């Protein structure tokens, strides 16, 4: 088990008296009492479930999974986050008491993963919704990597000052669920106009009249008994 060092903690005082600060005492009390809210949406969460077994035994870090955000101070996001799930994730984070922390686990959570190129319904990184403390890349990350991320989070907690963290979150809020969508052309008709096919959607938009004109010109398929 990795020990956490407190640089401001003085253990040389005689008569077994330890002098410290209120911030260090508060941080020390939270190191071994992280209660995570498990927000798993896809395959990355299966790797985190391995930590519950006796092989890795994440109870030695004081982790107690909670099902209510009001009783959790750590949310671990694992898997793809869609646009419809984004407001729910933000609401869960806002219901958690301060101080609260976030671990982003897996490529889909950090950048959108393989869905980040052509999917209109995937959030390109959970840090666009909530502030992230530790990024854990991988597809999926191994249980050993999850333990390392928790260890790094504990080291971060041991050195932070509560007032500075609250001030930083208030000045750098990144909650947003607003995305702009555009009407696109159908790609399953089997009949395309070459001008529309090679027209870059980033430089110009297809007028609605042109879109419905070419859509209605395609004949419906015929079925033969």
Curated annotation (Swiss-Prot):
GO terms, biological process: aerobic respiration; electron transport coupled proton transport; photosynthesis, light reaction
One protein family per Pfam: Oxidored_q6
UniProt xrefs under HAMAP family: NDH1_NuoB (MF_01356)
Textual note on the cofactor: Binds 1 [4Fe-4S] cluster.
Enzyme Commission designation: 7.1.1.-
Residues binding [4Fe-4S] cluster: 43-44, 108, 139
Subunit comment: NDH is composed of at least 16 different subunits, 5 of which are encoded in the nucleus.
Entry superkingdom: Eukaryota
Enzyme class, broadest EC rank: translocase
GO MF term list: 4 iron, 4 sulfur cluster binding; iron ion binding; NADH dehydrogenase (ubiquinone) activity; quinone binding
Protein name: NAD(P)H-quinone oxidoreductase subunit K, chloroplastic
Protein location: Plastid, Chloroplast thylakoid membrane
Family: Belongs to the complex I 20 kDa subunit family.
The species this protein was found in: Vitis vinifera
Requisite cofactors: [4Fe-4S] cluster
Entry function: NDH shuttles electrons from NAD(P)H:plastoquinone, via FMN and iron-sulfur (Fe-S) centers, to quinones in the photosynthetic chain and possibly in a chloroplast respiratory chain. The immediate electron acceptor for the enzyme in this species is believed to be plastoquinone. Couples the redox reaction to proton translocation, and thus conserves the redox energy in a proton gradient.
InterPro entries cross-referenced by the UniProt entry: NADH_UbQ_OxRdtase-like_20kDa (IPR006137), NADH_UQ_OxRdtase_20Kd_su (IPR006138)
Main location: plastid
Catalytic reactions of this protein: a plastoquinone + NADH + (n+1) H(+)(in) = a plastoquinol + NAD(+) + n H(+)(out); a plastoquinone + NADPH + (n+1) H(+)(in) = a plastoquinol + NADP(+) + n H(+)(out)
């Amino acid at each position: 088990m990795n020990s956490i060092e407190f640089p401001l903690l003085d253990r040389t005082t005689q008569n077994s008296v330890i002098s410290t600060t209120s911030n260090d005492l508060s941080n020390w009390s939270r190191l071994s009492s992280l209660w995570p809210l498990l927000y798993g949406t896809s395959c990355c969460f299966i790797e985190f479930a391995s930590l519950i077994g006796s092989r890795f035994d994440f109870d030695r870090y004081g982790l107690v999974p909670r099902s209510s955000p009001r009783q959790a101070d750590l949310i671990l996001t694992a898997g793809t986050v869609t646009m419809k799930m984004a407001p729910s994730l933000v609401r869960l984070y806002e219901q958690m008491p301060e101080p609260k922390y976030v671990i982003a686990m897996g490529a889909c959570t950090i950048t959108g993963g393989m869905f980040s190129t052509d999917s209109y319904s995937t959030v390109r990184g959970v840090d666009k919704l909530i502030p992230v403390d530790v990024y854990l890349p991988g597809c999926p990350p191994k249980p050993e990597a999850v333990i390392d991320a928790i260890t790094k989070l504990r080291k971060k907690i041991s050195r932070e000052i509560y007032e500075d963290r609250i001030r930083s979150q208030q000045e750098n809020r990144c909650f947003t669920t607003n995305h702009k969508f555009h009407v696109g052309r159908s790609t399953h008709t089997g009949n395309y106009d070459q001008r529309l096919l090679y027209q870059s959607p980033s430089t110009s938009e297809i007028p609605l009249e042109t879109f419905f004109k070419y859509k209605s010109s395609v004949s419906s398929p015929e079925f033969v008994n």
